[in-house]
Amino acid sequence: MGTIIDSHFLAFTALVTIAYQFLFFVVTALLKFDKVTDFAGSTNFIIIAALTLVIKGSWYFRQIILTLFVGIWGIRLGLFLLFRILQWGEDRRFDEMRSNLGRLAIFWIFQAVWVWAVSLPVTVVNASDRNPFLQVVDIVGWILWAVGFIVEGTADQQKLHFKRSSENRGKWCNVGLWKYSRHPNYFGEILLWWGIFVASTPVLKGAEWLVIIGPIFLTLLLLFVSGIPLLEDSADKKFGNVDGYRIYKKRTRLIYLLNVIYLFGLWLSRNVSSPSAMSRLLLFCH
């Protein structure tokens, strides 16, 4: 089993992620400086993708494209979050963690798991010796990534511009994409990582299909744990007594995801619903 894990760079990327996140944990714990937290997460994705591509050395077109996708996403998001927190001056998520080393450690452990798990599709593709011809599913995955990337970037900039305006102080963002969804940035992030998974499927074989854990983990994380629930609670505390906000919340979708899940379910049923394909998906090793 160790050979199988190492041949897919799973142990290697786990060690790299643990070391990288531990470094920033030490900085945060000793200096009480938490402004690099999101930057540490975003750049860790880039490091994993780049290292696995270079170490394997195959340089297949599909590997290069997916690595570039991760790099472009990580650079944009990492710099955006870093500049934003430097402007705002504090990260309220850590208000109760700065003096509690145990809770702070749990956060960084969870971030390491997040990075490693979500990176699984790219990690396995970059570790693979298989290089099938480009297929329609590759293009579909690239389109999903592009749409998700544009949506996330646009939503981030729209909200940042909204909050910078003194006229909008004390208001919730309801312009641009935020007029149609309460969390369009998270929709974009979920979509682009599902796109990366879809584009990785031509390479996957047997137990490698378990990399679907990556986008599933991200989706559940943002929907039910650390993403949307925290922001919804914060907004409810700030604007819960405002009639306009209650109307906005009632009329505006949380996230445009159900239609995407339905379409992906159709695709998945056509590609892995046969007995042989499902058996490959459920195999733990091959």
PLM segments and residue spans:
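Hydrophobic transmembrane alpha-helices
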Residues: 5-21, 44-75, 118-158, 163-267, ...
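C-terminal ends of transmembrane helices
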Residues: 22-33, 79-85
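Transmembrane helix irregularities
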Residues: 30-31, 75, 109, 181
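Juxtamembrane helix-capping/reentrant segments at transmembrane boundaries
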Residues: 31-45, 89-107, 171-178, 254
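Select subsegments of transmembrane alpha-helices in polytopic membrane proteins
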Residues: 39, 103-115, 182-189
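A basic- and aromatic-enriched beta-loop-alpha substructure that forms the phosphate/nucleotide-
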Residues: 62-100
